């Protein structure tokens, strides 16, 4: 196409992202249950949905921060390209957008897995495997569509729906923690 390519980065990034999200979310609820601080947190006058959403947002923001080195990669390729600046910025922007949406879904699934167990290791393994299966079966097509530069509203709605569904189910499960 005559442009410097950054495709390799965006082909491997989802596989790394599913592990990063599983690692960031494994402690969200599993550690609280394991240490017994979940009941103390629930005794505070804070709505359950606020606790879950804030935990999700904290992990999601950290995941997005973890994506910032990709921007550094863009500028390196930008300045190293012949002639300088000969890189498809639209494809890069679409790919970054795809990674942000993918991280929203992976973070939600990882948080959901953390609500299911009291062990951080089990939460990590369950989150990584769930993210892998979800990516392989469903998310890969939506992600590859966005990385080609085609930002379809259906893809965006799908990623947001996965994240919201995971948050809602996490709220329902978190409400049952300690009542067993």
Describe these PLM feature segments.
Residues 21-25, 37, 73, 108-109, ...:
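Hydrophobic/aromatic residues in alpha-helical transmembrane segments
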Residues 31, 43, 75-79, 115, ...:
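Transmembrane helix-loop junction
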Residues 1-4, 116, 123-180:
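Terminal transmembrane helical anchor/hairpin motif
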Residues 8, 23-24, 95-99, 155, ...:
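Residue-level signature of transmembrane alpha-helical cores of multipass secondary-active transporters
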Residues 28-58:
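Helix-loop-helix units of permease transmembrane domains in multi-pass membrane transporters
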Residues 8-31:
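Long, hydrophobic alpha-helical segments
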Residues 1-7, 54, 58-121:
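Secretory targeting signals
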Residues 13-21, 64, 68, 100, ...:
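Residue-level signal for the membrane-embedded core of alpha-helical transmembrane segments
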């Amino acid at each position: 196409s005559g442009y410097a390519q950054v495709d390799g980065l965006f082909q491997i990034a989802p596989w790394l992202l599913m592990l990063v999200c599983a690692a960031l979310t494994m402690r969200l609820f599993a550690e609280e249950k394991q240490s017994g601080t979940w009941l103390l947190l629930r005794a505070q006058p804070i709505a359950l949905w606020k606790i879950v959403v804030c935990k999700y947002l904290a992990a999601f923001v950290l995941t997005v921060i973890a994506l910032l080195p990709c921007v550094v990669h863009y500028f390196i390729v930008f300045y190293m390209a012949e002639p300088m600046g000969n890189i498809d910025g639209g494809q890069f922007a679409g790919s970054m957008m795809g990674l942000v949406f993918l991280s929203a879904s992976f973070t939600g699934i990882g948080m959901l897995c953390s609500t299911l167990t009291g062990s951080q290791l089990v939460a990590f393994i369950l989150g990584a495997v769930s993210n892998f299966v979800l990516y392989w079966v469903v998310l890969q097509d939506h992600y590859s569509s966005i990385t080609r530069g085609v930002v379809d509203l259906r893809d965006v709605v799908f990623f947001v729906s996965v994240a919201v569904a995971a948050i809602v189910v996490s709220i329902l499960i978190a409400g049952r923690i300690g009542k067993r």
